[in-house]
């Protein structure tokens, strides 16, 4: 498949992909994620169409907590909804993340992973914000450079739609979000070709509608609550295979080799780094240098962090 090349940063790559699959974007700015929402807002104002032939409706809220609440409500109304955030902004979204995941709604949060403020503020990249979301029920998919953001961000949206599990798609703040690279860009027709339109239709049919009312958000005692929580396990068990399926479709179109875990380095390595994010590109350069000197070292790149499938690690 032939793709055109453009020079852009990680935020622009994520915005380009997310716009294709988004009907409503609930936004609130926070460094270093703000450009993603800015791009989406600009494209919406210009009337740019997504893969469904409509213009994204953008709503800026009063805070990140409001943006997450708007995502939750919009998803319940049957609109594929996205937001963009980082750091303390992501923490403010956690209460709604539990609800979105618990109700099996296919929202996607694009996160420029950033340090959490502690003794002082830091706007630079680390994974302390996304690590605070491990237990929310969101699937978590990560990329290590701008081209990977372009290539794999569709997997988050596509797997969320088919698997009925929300996704947190993350890449490192500034190190990837603001790094400018020449990247091969998705054409929206190719993204549309990979989208399961039957799953989109089923999602819209589950929306709140007075023509077929349902009761949601009620109270349950411990016995029933526990059973209903366990009932969602089958959706999480299916996510790794669904992600692999869409990675396979991406690989087929692009000639890439994306997997849940990718290995790089000596086949008989006696020392291996397990990592995710922008450190992987640096590690690959170090591995090239060390293996050239006869050292047996390698890298396992983690792409799907949640749900974690340890058995898949043996594949690498």
Question: Where are these predicted regions, by residue range?
Answer:
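Conserved small/polar residues in nucleotide/adenosyl-binding loops
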Residues: 315
